[in-house]
Curated annotation (Swiss-Prot):
Alphabetized Pfam families for the sequence: Peptidase_M24
Record protein name field: Methionine aminopeptidase 2-1
Organism expressing this protein natively: Pyrenophora teres f. teres (strain 0-1)
Region (Disordered), start-end ranges: 1-100
Keyword Flavoprotein found: no
Gene3D superfamilies hit by this protein: Creatinase/methionine aminopeptidase superfamily (3.90.230.10), Winged helix-like DNA-binding domain superfamily/Winged helix DNA-binding domain (1.10.10.10)
Family indicated by similarity: Belongs to the peptidase M24A family. Methionine aminopeptidase eukaryotic type 2 subfamily.
Organismal lineage: Eukaryota, Fungi, Dikarya, Ascomycota, Pezizomycotina
Cited InterPro entries: Creatinase/aminopeptidase-like, Met_Aminopeptidase_Type2, Pept_M24, Pept_M24_MAP, Pept_M24A_MAP2, Pept_M24A_MAP2_BS, WH-like_DNA-bd_sf, WH_DNA-bd_sf
């Protein structure tokens, strides 16, 4: 289009050559839009000074062909460009980033024997071929960042856990553009797993069921753990929220330990080495609560994990204490390193009412005698597949009186139940988690943000 406008202006200059020389900009082929208004103002002056009739005609002709349409088109393009996110987040992320060009995560170079990967041409070629799945991961990571950064400002003491969980989940669904109510819609994009809101001695896997009246108080330590997925690429990240600065050292211990684990991670690195690095950092911290100095302990039976396609726990575990697993990380794998610190025993057990569930990828085919179990299994398969879900999600989809059928699926080994995991009462636990991918040339910490 720009070329066409330039030709029109050049023709006008030739027509007007008897009254005024063509501008140097037009002769040199510069963009006409920058000089269009200047040329028209010159023509107006000539008309006022009694320029010949031919000159007036040329001036009028030029004014008629003034490239207003181009300006209008530019304005329309601006109106249809990137939008600004709202609070609470409700603008689809592909409207904030209309070209599907999402921010890259934090890049960490490989070290020691893997340092050559940064400059190796073959590895760089492989890296360039991975853009499709990385775009999906980065999209999910950006949604996670925008939702959690809003949530950290929004959550206040006295708010109910149900309100908090639904606020986060509604925001994720709005940004993905998938409400998860139609068959299969939740498997296209949306929640990677239910929002965990585990308070104080409860370390993980707690989300409110229907009718829950719990609130978060000023003196509480709440772990906020939620996932976002795009076409089964799950971004898993968690932070600990407090209102009382007395717990800062507990939170800082987990953040530092998670960063140490990510730094140690890499292709061909043994899981046990990562666990040792995490424990060394975590247990170097202490926290003073109510006048008592307490050591921060790793919760030794909680781990990080690999992430598979539509599978939050991909088969490999990343310990947060030394010893144990000698399995190595491999190129192309995605991991969530999550660390848990505790002022209690540093060991969790199943406790409280179960809310988290997931269908097993290798679920056995067994005869179900409870009719509600058959109906529920069909719905779970269509709507969640192997993605974790909670009872609130079943309520939201219109299921009722499903608990007998759900328990039947659990006892049959088709669905796995994930009860809350708790340390001793009176203790405080914290969590920090990031998702990263082992690219051929570097580690990309997908979920890294300005907040953590």
């Amino acid at each position: 289009m720009a070329a066409k406008v330039a030709d029109d202006v050049a023709n006008l200059k030739l027509d007007d050559s008897n009254t005024k020389p063509a501008s140097g900009a037009a002769e040199n082929g510069d963009k006409p839009t920058g000089d269009a208004e200047h040329d028209d103002s010159d023509d107006d002056n000539e008309a006022e000074d009694g320029a010949p009739e031919a000159g007036e005609g040329a001036a009028k002709k030029k004014k008629k062909r003034k490239p207003r349409k181009k300006k209008k088109a530019a304005g329309a393009a601006g109106a249809g460009g990137a939008k600004v996110q709202t609070a609470p987040p409700r603008v689809r992320i592909d409207e904030v980033f209309p070209n599907d060009s999402y921010p890259e995560g934090e890049i960490q170079e490989y070290v020691n024997e893997n340092a050559y990967r940064t400059t190796n041409e073959e590895k760089r070629h492989l890296d360039r071929m991975n853009n499709d799945f990385l775009t999906e991961y980065r999209k999910g990571a950006e949604i996670h960042r925008e939702v959690r950064q809003w949530a950290q400002k929004w959550i206040k003491p006295g708010m109910g856990l149900t309100e908090i969980a639904e606020g986060i989940e509604d925001s994720v669904r709005a940004l993905t553009g998938h409400q998860g109510l139609g068959n299969g819609d939740a498997q296209i994009a949306g929640m990677g797993f239910p929002t965990g809101l585990s308070i104080n001695h409860c370390a993980a896997h707690y989300t409110p069921n229907a009718g829950n009246k719990m609130v978060v108080n000023y003196e509480d330590v709440m772990k906020v753990d939620f996932g976002v997925h795009i076409n089964g690429r799950i971004v898993d990240s968690a932070f600990t929220l407090t209102f009382d600065p007395v717990y800062d050292n507990l939170i800082n211990a987990c953040k530092a330990a998670t960063n140490a684990g990510i730094k140690e991670a890499g292709i061909d690195v043994r899981m046990s080495d990562i666990g040792a690095a995490i424990q060394e950092v975590m247990e170097s911290y202490e926290v003073e609560i109510k006048g008592e100095m307490l050591p921060v302990k790793c919760i030794r039976n909680l781990n990080g994990h690999s992430i598979g396609h539509y599978t939050i726990h991909g088969g490999k575990t990343v310990p947060i204490v030394k010893g144990g697993d000698q399995t190595k990380m491999e190129e192309g794998e995605t991991f969530a390193i999550e660390t848990f610190g505790s002022t209690g025993k540093g060991y969790v057990r199943d406790d409280m009412e179960t809310s988290h569930y997931a269908m097993k990828a290798d679920a056995p085919k067994v005869a179900l005698r409870v009719s509600s179990a058959k109906t529920l299994l069909s719905s779970i398969t269509k709507n969640f597949g192997t993605l974790p879900f909670c009872r609130r999600y079943l309520d939201r989809m219109g299921h009722d009186k499903y608990l007998l059928g759900l328990n039947n699926l659990v006892s049959a080994g088709i669905v796995e139940a994930y009860p809350p995991l708790c340390d001793i009462k009176g203790s405080y636990t914290a969590q920090s988690e990031h998702t990263f991918v082992l690219r051929p040339t570097c580690k990309e910490v997908l979920s890294r943000g300005d907040d953590y």
